[in-house]
Amino acid sequence: MVIKKPRGTYDLFGEEIEVFNKINDVLKTISNTYNCHEIKTPIFEHKELYIRNIGESSDIVTKEFYDFKDKSDRELALRPENTVGVIRSVVENKLLYTNPFPLKFYYLGPMFRYERPQSGRNRQFYQFGIEFIGVKNILNEIEGILFALDILKKLNITNWKLKVNYIGSIETREKWINSLKKYFNKYKDELSEDSKNRIEKNPLRILDDKVDGSKSFVKSCPKIEEFLTKEEKEESDNFIKCLKTIVNEFEFDSTLVRGLDYYSGPVFEIVSQSNKLTGQSTIIGGGRYTKLTKELGDNDYICFGFALGMERLMLAYRDENQFLSNNSVDVYIASIGSVESELVAMNFANQLRNLNYRVEVNFDLKKIDKQFKNSNKYNPKIILIYGDEDHKNKQVTLKNQKTLENKVIKLNELNNKIKEFFESDK
């Protein structure tokens, strides 16, 4: 029986991994410009870490966990997201006492959620994210939103919409949630079974439900701004005012909530309008969060972060950009001589690779016409032809694939001639 990959996973190779690596390089470059430092945390953590900090009623905890017990009967879980893992690492390693504020980190790695696979959504998925820890000014949070927008700009992704909301403190949100419970109980019969179960557990999830969220009575539900304190209203107004001076266009969406319990204050989502992202259109999302550092054993610090799914970002990138695969080599070496000649050809390859040229060498085909035919698979800029006669005369034939011109070069001049060729070809 053939063993295949598990449902909701995928193999990454060929052109897709080239796109992945291109985006990864852009993300790392932008992270550096924002003075963000890379952090890596374990792929699995203690299950309690997520239950306490994501929220027992969240979909992740109730439906999507990949959890297990190890041989010592400890309850562990594959990470479904990485914010709490980063905060756990920061607190455990006392990084809050050895770094200037705000601490700025970025991460990229696999996450795991047991959910129905669809376009841009898998059970194992790659997530990039940033965390600003110890934020003291709302402008740092706007800077985080600009970071997200810069990613799209650098990747030439233009078909998107920025949505923002202000959801107040955790205490304010509790008042809002209690009001939503009473409100949605009046419409219980018009809700799906999932939403009925959410009324008491987490009615905020009804607002972004793919079916119920679009119903008129859901859109008319109580809004968070009705429960904000005077200070929160002032901060919300200031957030919008500052954002307007920096971002050309965005939508204030009073129904926007994030899926995890630790969020408070300003939140945002960037929604792709690409046709390739059917069913899942949010490509970047995040906002302010508090209580996590305190919950994990330190003082309470205001933090801000966002995350994006690489798979969704790749789909959005592909929709607007033509990707030219880099499957060509710089130099193809056609070795058509004896073993002694082949060893010299191998030495050519090693010398050129040490100079950072991309090289393919073929030892199997002994007829030059077959070597030329085979070289077409690699689209080389130069072909080096080396056989027994060349070995005897200490020379090699260089074929320029652009002009189809052949030149006979002495072996001791080869590296310089190759260098001259690529410098003139820039």
Swiss-Prot record:
One of its GO terms (biological process) is histidyl-tRNA aminoacylation. Its main location: cytoplasm. The lineage of its organism: Bacteria, Bacillati, Mycoplasmatota, Mycoplasmoidales, Mycoplasmoidaceae. It comes from Malacoplasma penetrans (strain HF-2) (Mycoplasma penetrans). GO terms for cellular component: cytoplasm. It is an enzyme of class 6 (ligase). InterPro entries: aa-tRNA-synth_II (IPR006195), aa-tRNA-synth_II/BPL/LPL (IPR045864), Anticodon-bd (IPR004154), Anticodon-bd_dom_sf (IPR036621), His-tRNA-ligase (IPR015807), HisRS-like_core (IPR041715), HisRS/HisZ (IPR004516). Belongs to the class-II aminoacyl-tRNA synthetase family. PANTHER family: HISTIDINE--TRNA LIGASE, MITOCHONDRIAL-RELATED (PTHR43707:SF1), HISTIDYL-TRNA SYNTHETASE (PTHR43707). This is Histidine--tRNA ligase. GO terms for molecular function: ATP binding; histidine-tRNA ligase activity. It comes from the Bacteria.
